[in-house]
Amino acid sequence: FITYALFSKLENEDQLAGVLGHEIGHVIGRHSAERMAKQGLTQSIVSGVAVGIDPSTAQGAAAIANTLNMKYGRGDELESDDLGVKFMMDAGYNPAELIGVMKILKEAAGPNRTPERLSSHPDPENRIEKIKEAIEKYRK
C-alpha cells in the first residue's frame, strides 16, 4: 500500500511507478503469507521455550524471535525493491527514480531513525545500493 504522506512527497509518475512496483513485488513474492507463517513458527518456539523457564529467559527468547522476524522482513523489502526495478524497466519507467523514493523515505525518517537491526525495513542507504545493483542487473 501507499500512504497519502508518501504519495504527497513523490515528485513524478516514475516514483509512483516505483512504489507500486515495489508493492506488487510483495504480492508476487507472497511476503505476507510467508511472514505470517514465520511469525507463527517463531511464536510456537518461544511458547515452547517459555514453558517451565523463568520469565527473563522467555523474554530473551521472544527478543531473539522478534529480531529474526525483522531480518526476514528486511529481506522481503530488498526483494520487492529488486522486483520493483524490474517492473519499472519492463513498463518503460526510469528505475533510478526509485532511488529518489528512498531519499524521500530517509528524509522523512529524520536523523533519529530506528537502527536497521531493530527495523523491519533496511536503511534507505542500503536500499539505494541494492537498487543500483538491480538496475545494472536488469540492463544486461
Features from the language model and the residues they span:
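A Zn2+-metalloprotease active-site environment signal
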Residues: F1-K140
